[in-house]
Structures are given as structure tokens and as C-alpha cells.
């Protein structure tokens, strides 16, 4: 996909839920394995939707992953023979993830991260905007709006079938029962007084 060289770099895969971020990360990791490169995949411990030890896409593709509690724990699992470091659900990592990713790329690793670029309110999510700014390559994926069928760049959180309010908690790990992809026009975030 990108010109391969001996220097490290950062790739960010971002977009709304159900846009194929984990699927794309898995595809890139599998391609490196076909090329006889050594890859390791990480995920935050908080992400246990489908598996505690795998990154799993919504369509069922999976790859083995190391769950970590803190960004700097990633260093404990890196060895010299590694070529590619992949990190899924990067928005759930602590603020140190930007430094960790920078250090890994500066050491010569290809670093692939995937995550939500916006929270359910449509605002920048976690450290993803900073990672996008320092990345050599950014891939922004879109889903299909579950309301109208247009390209969807936002994630709609639903609570009992209704849009979540703006001041509801930001982090709530779920799947289709609590989130839907939406386009700009179908995305709704009421304030608590509107509910």
C-alpha cells in the first residue's frame, strides 16, 4: 500500500464505528505476515467485546492480540525481530500512547494504529487527533448511515433506542446494540434538558 523503506513510520486508520477499522488493521497485519515480517498486535484491556485475546472485526475476522492496561506496557512485549507494531482501539489508551507510538516509529518500526477519530458527540476522541497529526499515512474510513444510507462519518450512541445525551459518559464499550453509524445529518446529540 505504501512505499516500503527501512525507516519507521506511523499509519492511522480511523473513522466511525462499523467503518471497517479493525478489519483494515487485520488486513494490513496479515499482509505483513505473508511478506515474512514479524508483527505484534495490541489492544486495550477494556476492549473485551468479542474476545479478550484477539482483535475481532464486526464481521468476524480476527488476529491474536496482547491486551495491555497502559500504553507504556507495550514496550515490555517488543523484541528486536519485530517489524510491525499494530494497536487497535487506540482511542481507549492513556495519553502516553502518542509518545509510545513516536518512540516505536523512531526506532524503525512500522506502527499501525486504528481507532475512532470522534466520540459519540462528534468531537475529537482521545489521542487519535494527535496521532493523525504526526502520522505519515492517515486512512479515514466511512460506514453506511443506518438511518438514510449515506456515507457515515459519525457514531450514534443509543440508550434504550434513543440518542444519548451530550453529557452522558464518553466511554461505554459496546457493539450494535448501543451504537450505529450515522451521517452528519442523521446524527443527533440532545442535551439532557432536551430529553
UniProtKB/Swiss-Prot annotation:
Main localization category: cytoplasm
Residues given in the record as ATP binding sites: 15-22, 88-91
GO molecular function, one term: zinc ion binding
Residues holding Zn(2+): 145, 148, 183, 186
One annotated GO biological process: DNA biosynthetic process
Domain of life: Bacteria
One Pfam family matching this protein: TK
Entry GO CC: cytosol
Active site: 89 (proton acceptor)
Keywords, alphabetical: ATP-binding, Cytoplasm, DNA synthesis, Kinase, Metal-binding, Nucleotide-binding, Transferase, Zinc
Subcellular location: Cytoplasm
Similarity comment: Belongs to the thymidine kinase family.
Subunit (UniProt): Homotetramer.
Protein known as: Thymidine kinase
Taxonomy of the source species: Bacteria, Bacillati, Bacillota, Bacilli, Bacillales
Amino acid at each position: 500500500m505504501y512505499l516500503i523503506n527501512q525507516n519507521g513510520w506511523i499509519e492511522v486508520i480511523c473513522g466511525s464505528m462499523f467503518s471497517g477499522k479493525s478489519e483494515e488493521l487485520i488486513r494490513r497485519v496479515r499482509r505483513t505476515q505473508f511478506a515474512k515480517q514479524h508483527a505484534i498486535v495490541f489492544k486495550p484491556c477494556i476492549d473485551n467485546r468479542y474476545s479478550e485475546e484477539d482483535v475481532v472485526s464486526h464481521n468476524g475476522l480476527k488476529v491474536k492480540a496482547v491486551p495491555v492496561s497502559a500504553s507504556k506496557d507495550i514496550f515490555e512485549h517488543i523484541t528486536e525481530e519485530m517489524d510491525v507494531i499494530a494497536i487497535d482501539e487506540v482511542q481507549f489508551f492513556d495519553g502516553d500512547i502518542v509518545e509510545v507510538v513516536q518512540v516505536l516509529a523512531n526506532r524503525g518500526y512500522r506502527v499501525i494504529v486504528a481507532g475512532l477519530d470522534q466520540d459519540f458527540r462528534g468531537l475529537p476522541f482521545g489521542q487519535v487527533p494527535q496521532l493523525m497529526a504526526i502520522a505519515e499515512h492517515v486512512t479515514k474510513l466511512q460506514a453506511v448511515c443506518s438511518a438514510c444510507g449515506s456515507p457515515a462519518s459519525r457514531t450514534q450512541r443509543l440508550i434504550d433506542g434513543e440518542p444519548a445525551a451530550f453529557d452522558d459518559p464518553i466511554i461505554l464499550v459496546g457493539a450494535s446494540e448501543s451504537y450505529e453509524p450515522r451521517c452528519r445529518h442523521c446524527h443527533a446529540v440532545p442535551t439532557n434538558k432536551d430529553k
